[in-house]
Amino acid sequence: MSLDSPTFGCTDSPVRRERGQKAVFCGLTSIVWLHRKMQDAFFLVVGSRTCAHLLQAAAGVMIFAEPRFGTAVLEEQDLAGLADAHKELDREVAKLLERRPDIRQLFLVGSCPSEVLKLDLDRAAERLSGLHAPHVRVYSYTGSGLDTTFTQGEDTCLAAMVPTLDTTEAAELIVVGALPDVVEDQCLSLLTQLGVGPVRMLPARRSDIEPAVGPNTRFILAQPFLGETTGALERRGAKRIAAPFPFGEEGTTLWLKAVADAYGVSAEKFEAVTAAPRARAKKAIAAHLETLTGKSLFMFPDSQLEIPLARFLARECGMKTTEIATPFLHKAIMAPDLALLPSNTALTEGQDLEAQLDRHEAINPDLTVCGLGLANPLEAKGHATKWAIELVFTPVHFYEQAGDLAGLFSRPLRRRALLNGGAA
């Protein structure tokens, strides 16, 4: 073994915890992918015009396109306490449901303004569910930047749904976390070929096929930012299958192997099902290794995808992890990925932006993964950057996306090489 070969395992490594200035989206942005996933749902943000502009810009749609989300704007009289916000909300919901009879699930989404005003959206959801049952179920959750960052909006949304799921004694598997439809289909196909089932998804594409949960339910996370949802499912009696997350060939194989072992799938069958897609994934990743191998990596906290992605880049792409920061580090959920990270990786939970920027300058990494607000200033200083938001909005899970995932990181390095007059 080469002396340069890294050792692996960060399970017991020290974690720097920072609670300073942050540069990250609020949880409202998760509506952008959730409204596309849940085809009979509508997300009504109770917030300000700033919330409305954020969602419209993030989703890349105009409001006249009739997307499945909107904002109940808190006006000046609401902020001044001169209007009954709950009556106004009831009126807006009634108008919405009359105009959109296809809605079966309505989510009241809390924002910074509604949190400051202490609007009781839980009580409002309960009241509105009673008014509009059985046609529509109304939920509430928070996407406020005071409470959530970026992907945590999905976590609070799914956690709000779990208590309302039907109870079952059936031995079913739930795959938890929103995936693009094409990726979900690939996931279900692999599990079906392994003989695992029945398999349900949370969130489901429609409310009439949402999962039930009970003491014989097993679940596995497809997304790493679902700590609150995990707790809600476990309180309903479901048991979590622990696994690395399905990024890259190795991560996908270990994820599927954890499910296969839980369901008693033979090694021969597992090999027969996974051999061909594993080979395709390895070949697709290999096309990017010349660009990625040996390059240093620094990740600012953004989406909670950082640790499993760093594992993928270190082990499958040969990158050198320096500092890997994440908004929140749920050690129980991340344990399988932490065990596979290079042991010399510096782990950070949370953010103190100025201090982290100073460390970044001292390290001077080859590739920096960061939010939109940091990317342009860092590019101007000569750093190659990858927008972290692309890793959430691009299909990156499972075998068939492994090459695309590697390409997301190799492209900025090739671009920087071209700008510097080198070979691409």
From Swiss-Prot:
Primary enzyme class: oxidoreductase
Catalysis: reaction(s): chlorophyllide a + oxidized 2[4Fe-4S]-[ferredoxin] + 2 ADP + 2 phosphate = protochlorophyllide a + reduced 2[4Fe-4S]-[ferredoxin] + 2 ATP + 2 H2O
Pathway: Porphyrin-containing compound metabolism; bacteriochlorophyll biosynthesis (light-independent)
Cofactor note as given: Binds 1 [4Fe-4S] cluster per heterodimer. The cluster is bound at the heterodimer interface by residues from both subunits.
UniProt-listed Enzyme Commission number(s): 1.3.7.7
SUPFAM superfamilies: Helical backbone' metal receptor
Gene Ontology BP terms: light-independent bacteriochlorophyll biosynthetic process; photosynthesis, dark reaction
GO molecular function: 4 iron, 4 sulfur cluster binding; ATP binding; metal ion binding; oxidoreductase activity, acting on iron-sulfur proteins as donors; oxidoreductase activity, acting on the CH-CH group of donors, iron-sulfur protein as acceptor
Keywords: 4Fe-4S, ATP-binding, Bacteriochlorophyll biosynthesis, Chlorophyll biosynthesis, Iron, Iron-sulfur, Metal-binding, Nucleotide-binding, Oxidoreductase, Photosynthesis
UniProt: [4Fe-4S] cluster binding residues: C26, C51, C112
Coiled coil spans: none
Listed cofactors: [4Fe-4S] cluster
Keyword hit for Signal: no
Record note on what altering C112A does: Does not form heterotetramers
Pfam families, sorted: Oxidored_nitro
Function: Component of the dark-operative protochlorophyllide reductase (DPOR) that uses Mg-ATP and reduced ferredoxin to reduce ring D of protochlorophyllide (Pchlide) to form chlorophyllide a (Chlide). This reaction is light-independent. The NB-protein (BchN-BchB) is the catalytic component of the complex.
Family under the similarity heading: Belongs to the BchN/ChlN family.
Full protein name: Light-independent protochlorophyllide reductase subunit N
